[in-house]
Amino acid sequence: MLLLLAEYLQQFHKGFAVFQYLSLRGILGVLTALSLALWLGPWMIRTLQIRQIGQAVRNDGPQSHLSKSGTPTMGGALILSAIGISTLLWADLSNRYVWTVLIVTLLFGAIGWVDDYRKVIEKNSRGLPSRWKYFWQSVFGLTAAIFLYQTAPTTVETTLIVPFLKDVTIPLGIGFVVLTYFVIVGSSNAVNLTDGLDGLAIMPTVMVGGALGIFCYLSGNVKFAEYLLIPYVPGSGELIVFCGALIGAGLGFLWFNTYPAQVFMGDVGALALGAALGTIAVIVRQEIVLFIMGGIFVMETLSVVIQVASFKLTGKRVFRMAPIHHHFELKGWPEPRVIVRFWIITVILVLIGLATLKLR
């Protein structure tokens, strides 16, 4: 929106041409979203408290979590609002990738909103039935996958890139749709499973989103892409504005979500942010790198799968409780220790992911 204004004003002063730089608009995206989140946060928390939109806590969970009951939830709406406004202000609104990621994010956020709303109304932690949640995730995920497949200008946009191996690529063809579906839906649910402790999900999301922003910037520049031997995806660089907005909104939300949390993001935030990460990774052809950088999300998801499979097959549990962050809590780790150690692991994994740019 403001990019169009800047383009118009260039005829009066050449200084407005500076807004053509992606790096500047990415930074402005961060600052705008951060400012919005910090400004609107207190108002949203008060509104949620007044309307008694509080978190329902599982009775079979860690006893320390019972004190969290009633903490305002659905704070993810704050994150999505800040991301949306900042992106609309600073991104090129003629870019199809910007709209694809925005729409997918908001649609998955809508699923989460319904889920959270039902939890609040029914005053339990069940929410939207799983079958309906996965149905709508599948509808939106498949729609995005088919759209990206049909609008891909070249086969580069539908080829799987294997990190660390410069000459290994796998043409996917129609298999791109299947992979994209699993990446988007899987990422959405993985972030949601991780969102069980104060600040646990949002900081890894910010770190992974920031790293993906770097991939977007490099993949959208033909010279950088050729030099680094990564896919050149025209237009993908514009997603650095969205990634910047995600960083700013995430950090602004963390201000209120840090231990002890004043507000929880809820499914409206977790499902949306996970879907956003998955969609961005697909666009810049870095699905495997997302798997590496989002290792905490993967670990949380695998712990649930292993726990359920083990209990159904043998009647025994592998972990004291799943997702795995609860396992460490029940082992006696204080909540802040679990959170910070998971953050540290994410820093390491993100650095490994970024290292794939040169280690080939």
Curated annotation (Swiss-Prot):
Keywords: Cell cycle, Cell division, Cell inner membrane, Cell membrane, Cell shape, Cell wall biogenesis/degradation, Magnesium, Membrane, Metal-binding, Peptidoglycan synthesis, Transferase, Transmembrane, Transmembrane helix
Annotated catalysed reactions: UDP-N-acetyl-alpha-D-muramoyl-L-alanyl-gamma-D-glutamyl-meso-2,6-diaminopimeloyl-D-alanyl-D-alanine + di-trans,octa-cis-undecaprenyl phosphate = di-trans,octa-cis-undecaprenyl diphospho-N-acetyl-alpha-D-muramoyl-L-alanyl-D-glutamyl-meso-2,6-diaminopimeloyl-D-alanyl-D-alanine + UMP
InterPro entries: Glycosyl_transferase_4 (IPR000715), PNAcMuramoyl-5peptid_Trfase (IPR003524), PNAcMuramoyl-5peptid_Trfase_CS (IPR018480)
Protein localization: Cell inner membrane
Protein's pathway: Cell wall biogenesis; peptidoglycan biosynthesis
GO BP term, example: regulation of cell shape
Membrane topology, record value: Multi-pass membrane protein
Cofactor dependence: Mg(2+)
Chief location: membrane
Single annotated GO MF: UDP-N-acetylmuramoyl-L-alanyl-D-glutamyl-meso-2,6-diaminopimelyl-D-alanyl-D-alanine:undecaprenyl-phosphate transferase activity
Cellular component, GO annotation: plasma membrane
Coiled coil: none
Enzyme class: transferase
Function: Catalyzes the initial step of the lipid cycle reactions in the biosynthesis of the cell wall peptidoglycan: transfers peptidoglycan precursor phospho-MurNAc-pentapeptide from UDP-MurNAc-pentapeptide onto the lipid carrier undecaprenyl phosphate, yielding undecaprenyl-pyrophosphoryl-MurNAc-pentapeptide, known as lipid I.
UniProt record similarity statement: Belongs to the glycosyltransferase 4 family. MraY subfamily.
NCBIfam families in alphabetical order: mraY
Protein's recorded name: Phospho-N-acetylmuramoyl-pentapeptide-transferase
